[in-house]
């Protein structure tokens, strides 16, 4: 089951959180859900070159809190905050109402360990007609330098312009999809090539999340330094009778 199901949806409520956090009754729920979709599409379309990794949406009454996780925050913010103002104005026009929108830009610290940014990098290279094996190898090497526990990359379609479509994947390290406490980051992107569409899937294993581990680490006393052991000496008595 863990091999087929969506890795993030499988772990919602266990180790993952929802990307939209708000409550609405059954009458307004479809409307707000469509608004969330419109907001995400608008941000991804207008900030396609900003390296958007994640978009989080929270609602409080008539206020929308938008958190944009990006690899290039300078592109989103713009000079003197002009980029945020343009984004806010565009979102208000898209929603059709004068909504109060608060935008928070968060920089992604480990770019080469984020599944969405890795998948975006691979699709950009594939659209430039770079060999998929070379691109996948480079992405895995960059992820290993970022000290991830494991990574799996799958590319499907008419690879390198082949007549028959196929799927190939490469895995380095551990990617335990069945383990619920495993912190798995997953992303799916499509590359538009002259031969057709290529699908790119990326799984990144960042370690296991154990409940209460941080609390135990804070409460644990500092380890006492160990005493130095005397160097042991061994005598060769193999020649003795």
UniProtKB/Swiss-Prot annotation:
Keyword Transmembrane helix listed? The answer is no
Disordered: region residues: 215-241
UniProt lists compositionally biased (Basic and acidic residues) regions at 232-241
Keyword terms of this UniProt record: Ribonucleoprotein, Ribosomal protein, RNA-binding, rRNA-binding
Alphabetized SMART domains for the sequence: KH
One biological process term in Gene Ontology: translation
- Give the Pfam families listed for this entry: KH_2, Ribosomal_S3_C
Q: What is one cellular component GO term in this UniProt entry?
A: cytosolic small ribosomal subunit
Q: What does this protein do?
A: Binds the lower part of the 30S subunit head. Binds mRNA in the 70S ribosome, positioning it for translation.
HAMAP family linked to this entry:
Ribosomal_uS3_B
Q: Which family does it belong to?
A: Belongs to the universal ribosomal protein uS3 family.
Report what the protein is called.
Small ribosomal subunit protein uS3
């Amino acid at each position: 089951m863990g091999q087929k199901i969506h890795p993030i949806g499988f772990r919602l409520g266990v180790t993952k959180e929802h990307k939209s956090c708000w409550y609405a009754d059954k009458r307004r729920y479809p409307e707000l859900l469509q608004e969330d979709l419109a907001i995400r599409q608008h941000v991804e379309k207008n900030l396609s070159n900003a390296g958007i990794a994640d978009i989080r949406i929270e609602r409080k009454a008539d206020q929308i809190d938008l958190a944009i996780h990006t690899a290039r925050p300078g592109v989103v913010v713009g000079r003197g905050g002009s980029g945020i103002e343009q984004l806010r104005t565009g979102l208000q026009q898209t929603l059709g109402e004068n909504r109060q929108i608060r935008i928070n830009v968060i920089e992604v610290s480990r770019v080469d360990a984020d599944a969405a940014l890795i998948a975006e990098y691979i699709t950009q290279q594939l659209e430039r007609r770079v060999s998929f094996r070379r691109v996948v190898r480079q992405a895995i090497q960059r992820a290993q330098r970022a000290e991830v526990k494991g990574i799996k990359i799958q590319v499907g379609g008419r690879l390198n312009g082949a007549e028959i479509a196929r799927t190939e994947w490469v895995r380095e390290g551990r990617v335990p999809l069945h383990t619920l406490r495993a912190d798995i980051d997953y992303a799916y992107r499509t590359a538009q090539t002259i031969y057709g569409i290529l699908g790119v899937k990326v799984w990144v294993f960042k370690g296991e999340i154990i409940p209460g581990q941080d609390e135990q680490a804070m409460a644990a006393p500092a380890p006492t330094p160990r005493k130095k052991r005397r160097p042991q000496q061994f005598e060769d008595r193999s020649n003795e009778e």
